[in-house]
Amino acid sequence: MKYSKKWSSLFLASALTLSTFSIAQPQVQAAEVEKPTKPTNVIMLVMDGSSNNAVTLSRWYKGGNLAMDEILSGGVRTYSAESAITDSAPAATALATGHKSNDKFVGVLPATVSSPGLEQVAKEDAFKPVANVLEGAKQQGKATGLIATSEIQHATPAGFSAHATNRSQYDNIAEQQVYQNIDVVLGGGSESLTPGTTKNARKDGENLVNVLNEKNYDFVKTRDELLNSTSSKIWGSFAPSALAYDLDRAKTRPTEPTLAEMTGKAIDTLKKDEDGFFLFVEGSKVDWAAHKNDTIGIISDILSFDDAVKEAVDFAKEDGNTMVIAVTDHGNSGITMGNANTSSTYSSIPVSAYIDPLKKATMTVEGALSQLKEDKSNLVEVAALYGLDDLTEDELATLKSAKDIGDEMVKMLANRANIGYTTGGHTGEDVFLYSYGPSKITGLVENTDLAHSMAQFMGFDLNKLTDDLYIPATKAFKDKGYTTKIDLADKENPKFIAQKDDVTFTIPVNKNTLIYEDASTKTTKTHTFDTINVYNGTEFYVSKKVLNVIK
């Protein structure tokens, strides 16, 4: 595998040279790795779809410093293998595996590499699964955790826990997450765990909640159940899809935990492992609010994310051997303090002109619209929940006739608060890097650098890990004289089959098992391995340890 091979030698030699994937980049320095005196921990926090300007606005809104301010250490370049502006799936892949990838790809190598300065991927390696830092932590014997305020199967948490050629493959992602045996998993997405008729319900007929119970997880559904759990294995599924925005929670879903509460509980649970832990945390819905240009939603969940960062940093300060990284995966919306209203008067406009209109809102646009009656008879009251408490006749008429009321509401509030937006999509700027603890990263780095820094701190090499965890099953069995096929009779449950004489091996998709059958002795045995079986549409990939059971 040629892609990203530079990292193997660079990181084994030193912890100094970063920005491997770009042409004419300045050399970036990372602190030399300190030899740990006790097990290492890593807490990786991602504020999805935020931007530097959004953080600035949130600080003004809060009226004081953010927890993130204390650990600001550099910047991150976010482009993907094919674009200056990345999607969340390749961004997560970069942060988790050290490989830039393509739009919609989760934890697999790209098929197209066109961004300047990147090495091409060998044709046979396109779509190949690549190991992530959570999988590496597991191999080191560490406890692992995964948290998100979106569905836990969403692109960014998926990038740290699964491998799929399209981020929309929730069935595959959910099943892989269950069979990864992650110790603590907290977020939304319960509908992808069981069969049903809803959009993201399972189509393969498998009930993963039953599997979790068989694996002795404490399966919790509410804040109180989570906080009262004493189990070392917790799966918290608090909503069918995403959790509520932080600002809306008290009124719309009071039984859901906050991001900070989930983070604190995960740390308290994982820290008991004598080998240390890896924890991934995502504040997911900053991105969703930015796509809508919902200023209140952006601020709501940046501040919620900041509370989670405080939980992580407070623990790291006490522990002394925990690396904390906080970052956004990409910009979104082009939000600015200042718009066409301020073009000639910006130098005399006080902070209050931006913040006071925003302070009137008590809910995000999503939360406010959840209170709208079907006949829209309470439209004025709903607008007031979003801070629009003094609608003009023209504004009210606009809302009444709007095809998308929320779209008009966010425009009105942004105009009153002098907030500008350039897009409803992602943006390509460099973003802030926040880091704390041993081997703190500084300077302007690539998103891929963060994965390699975390891996090195925990004591493994990601490229070697990929070679151990994901080998092509076809070659492995054919080299031993087996005939092989991929059985697609059940399209929702592909399986790899290898046969020789009376022996048959069956490898189910997304699980961590292999079934051995010998017809001559009527023997059947199930082997369990250290990683999941991944099917990328053309090939099955399995752990190298499978070679130990092939006769």
Regions of interest found by a model, annotated:
Residues 9, 13-20:
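Secretory targeting and sorting signals
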Residues 100-175, 181:
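Extracytoplasmic mature domains of secreted/periplasmic and thylakoid-lumen proteins
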Residues 40-41, 50-55, 60-93, 102, ...:
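A post-motif C-terminal structural segment
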Residues 18-34:
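Sec-dependent signal peptide cleavage junction
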Residues 12, 29-36, 84, 92, ...:
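Cofactor-binding active-site loop characterized by glycine-rich and histidine/acidic residues
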Residues 1-11:
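Bacterial N-terminal signal peptides that target proteins for export
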